[in-house]
A protein has these predicted regions:
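Alpha-helical cap/lid subdomain in secreted, periplasmic
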Residues: 31, 51-189
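Serine-esterase "nucleophile elbow" of acetyl-processing enzymes
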Residues: 1-48, 52-61
Length: 189
């Protein structure tokens, strides 16, 4: 029997800004014939995910949860500790239900590009400054719970030099999605 996966997250899981065929999660699903349930919702925060965790994860009885959260929290000026606490609650809940957990560390953003192409906001700098801290805290969680992870932040750390991978400074275009797919396939292949 093949594994059932739930991918829980925000627009970075959903595939905002690209056709479904170009979304990295859908590429994993079709390339490797995986049973993946994409529970990415545009704009979702870790608090939102916590609220819908029972319905979107536990009630689907997956073997494996891929969880990536934090960007929208930071774009809402929420502290990293709040994000990490929410993610840890979801990790514990999944593990207590015999669900293996993989963590996704969100990619970097390009504040200037986001201000120009997504929407004007004074929170991009806060997000940009705190993504490295979130990355470190998520790596600590992965170590504490012996979890597998994909570090999309390190992949896009020099985001300004990789602006050709972004739709709007936050969301990745088909080329960026393909980079996430190539990185993620090592964990799922």
């Amino acid at each position: 029997m093949k594994n059932k996966y739930v991918f829980l997250g925000d627009s970075l899981i959903f595939g905002y800004g690209v056709k479904p065929k170009d979304n990295w999660v859908n590429k994993l699903k079709t390339t490797y014939d995986l049973d993946i349930h994409n529970k990415g919702i545009n704009g979702s925060t870790s608090t939102d995910m916590l609220v819908r965790f029972q319905k979107d994860v536990i009630n689907l009885y997956p073997n494996i949860l891929f969880l990536m959260a934090g960007t929208n929290d930071l774009l809402s000026n929420r502290p990293v500790t709040s994000i990490v606490n929410n993610i840890e609650v979801m990790i514990k809940d999944a593990l207590s239900n015999n669900i293996e957990v993989y963590i996704g560390i969100p990619p970097n953003i390009i504040p200037e590009m986001a201000n120009e192409l997504f929407m004007r906001s004074d929170t991009y700098d806060y997000c940009n400054e705190n993504l490295p801290l979130l990355r470190n805290e998520l790596l600590n969680l992965c170590t504490s719970y012996s979890l597998k992870y994909i570090d999309f932040y390190s992949l896009t750390e020099n985001a300004k030099e990789l602006s050709n991978l972004y739709v709007d400074g936050i969301h990745l275009n088909p080329q960026g999605q393909n980079l996430l797919f190539k990185t993620a396939k090592k964990l799922f292949n």
